[in-house]
């Protein structure tokens, strides 16, 4: 894209998830919780894939989802269900030695 604002935003987004005082893994969990509270299914999927790539365990995933549920309330339950399905699908892909999407 020739749009400088979009390019700058994409660069900022990439840099926000780089290793720093917080690990990439923690930042992806934060992104996942935020995306769940905001009810953005595409964003949830994106962060789940990155969480799995970063080695997030089931225990870590469900603990993060508990935070999302408290912050977002019961309205996020449909998104939470999809997130659990997607997380389990991604874990299965890894277990089967297959590549994760994106």
Where are these regions (language model features)?
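Alpha-helical scaffold segments that form or flank carboxylate-/histidine-based iron centers
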Residues: 26-35, 64-73
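Short, thiol/selenol-centered motifs that function as redox-active sites or metal-ligating centers
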Residues: 30, 34-46
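Short, solvent-exposed positions on alpha-helices
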Residues: 24, 42, 59-62
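Acidic, glycine/proline-rich low-complexity segments that act as flexible tails and inter-domain linkers
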Residues: 1-26, 76-102
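Iron-sulfur (Fe-S) cluster-binding segments and ferredoxin-like electron-carrier domains
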Residues: 46-61, 87
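Amphipathic C-terminal alpha-helical segment
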Residues: 40, 71-78
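Residues in soluble alpha-helical coiled-coils and helical-bundle/repeat scaffolds
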Residues: 17, 38-39, 56
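Amphipathic alpha-helical segments within well-ordered protein domains
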Residues: 14, 31, 48-52, 65-66
């Amino acid at each position: 894209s020739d749009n400088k604002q979009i390019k700058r935003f994409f660069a900022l987004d990439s840099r926000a998830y780089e290793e720093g005082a917080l690990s990439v893994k923690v930042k992806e969990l934060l992104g996942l919780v935020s995306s769940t509270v905001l009810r953005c299914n595409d964003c949830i999927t994106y962060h789940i894939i990155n969480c799995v790539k970063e080695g997030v365990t089931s225990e870590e995933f469900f603990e993060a989802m508990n935070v999302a549920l408290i912050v977002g309330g019961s309205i996020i339950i449909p998104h939470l269900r999809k997130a659990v399905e997607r997380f389990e699908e991604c874990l299965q892909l890894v277990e089967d030695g297959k590549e994760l999407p994106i």
